[in-house]
Every structure is written in C-alpha cells, then in structure tokens.
Amino acid sequence: MKALILSTATGGGHNTAAHAVLEALTERGVECRFEDCVAFGGQKLSATVSNVYVKFVQAAPDAFGRLYRFAKAISTPRIKSPVYLFNAAYARKMEQLLTDYAPDLIVCTHMFGGQSVTYLRRHDLWNGLFAMVMTDYTIHPFIEDIECDVMFTCKAAMPSARRLALPKSAYEFTGIPVSLSCRPCTDKRAAKEAVGLDPERPEVVLVGGSMGAGNLPEMIARILPVLGENGHLTVVCGSNVDALRRATEAYGSDPRVSLRAQVTPLTPLIAAA
C-alpha cells in the first residue's frame, strides 16, 4: 500500500502532524511520501504563502481573528470558497506525481491540500481513499469545501462538526496525531540532564507553538508567582522574534527563566517538564 501525505508550512503544526501520520503508517508497513501541497504551484508560491501567513498572525493577531470570524460567518457547504479556487488552480500539477507514485491513500493535514485533492476527485483525476486530518481544536472556515472519505478531528470539535454537510460516519474523533516519541517520561532526572536542565529543580515548559502564539510575557508573569524560588521555567518562543525580545527585556535577568527561540526536536524538552 502507498500513501501520499500532503501538508504545508503555514505554521509548524501541520507538518508535525503530517510526519506523525507518516511515522505511524510506515511502522505499519505502508510506503509513504511527504509533499508540500502548495509547492505544486511553485516553491516561490509556497514560501510566500507561508511567510505572509506567519507574519500576519504574529504582527496582527487581532486582525487575523476578525478575518477568521468573518470567514467562519460566510463559510457554507452550498458553494466553494475563494480559497478552494486558489488551491484548485494548481491541483492539476499533481497529476504527474499521482500517475508516477500511484498512491492508494492521500492524507492531508492542511485545508489547502484537502481542497486540491477534492478538485482532483471532482474531475475524476484521482479516486483513491482520501483522509483529512484536522490539526486545530476546532473545525475552521471553508472546511466544507473538502469532500473526503474520513475526517480525523478531536472531540472538542464535535459542536463545530455538526454544522458541516458530511455524514456522521465520516468523522473519527481521534485527536491530533503526535509522534511515536511523545510517550510518558519514565525517568525525569535523565530527561532533564539530556537537555541540560538541573535535575534537582522542578521544570515548567511554556510553548507558544512554532509561531510563538499567545501573549508569552503575560503568561510568564502568571506562572512565576506559583513557580517558587527553586522552580525553573523554559519558554519556547518559536519564530516570533518580537515575543522573544519582549520576554527577554522583561525576564532575561531572572535566573528562574530560560528563553528559547525555535527548538527542534521539541519532544525531549517536553519530556523534561
């Protein structure tokens, strides 16, 4: 059996989930291939889409929130969205790969790939099994565009899922895929030593995701009073340079706080917490 995993780099979570799916399928003997779906429209397009999205979310989160709510308000299963048309525009460029690789299954961890594959199926250009993996804790706008065989999501998304024009049998409430390495830590002391932390100190890890989402300085301020003098806090700001700068200005001199940018892989640090 062959599987094609489609994702894109608008934030790191989609790719992380995609690689978790790839890892799990490979362990079960499935031949897998990973591709950036937007890159079928060109590497420059993929880089531009990713950079614009990440910078917009980081620089203007309130504006992004308003845009998101507007998109949710106009999202409908009755007509395809402008976002679908964007992703349909480069979908036919996947044909050669589908012919050469001939996957039995396509798994998408981003709406963009899901919309492209939907276009291919609607035009009889590919007819294998199609699975959509939601990497958010909600059903986001324009997901109605996607016509998949099964959609994997989390239980928190059940209320949102009910408004979609998909049969209940199409949902699997499994949660967001994680790497096989994300297992309960059995030796905290060794885990702390492995990432250079003091094994004698209680450790808290604050992660803002790959984009450094949320008000990290404010979260640090809330955690420190309950951390105690012996505790230690590691803050991962991801690619959010501004969040790292503000946190450094406010807490860089506090010996209880360590500030990091992007951490790859993140699992060993989480295991130490």
Regions found by a protein language model. Give the residues of each.
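Active-site and donor-binding regions of nucleotide-sugar-utilizing enzymes
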Residues: G12, A17, R69-F173
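Conserved N-terminal ligand/cofactor-binding loop architecture of enzyme catalytic domains
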Residues: A20-E95
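Short loop/edge segments at beta-strand edges and connector loops
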Residues: M134, G175, A261-V263
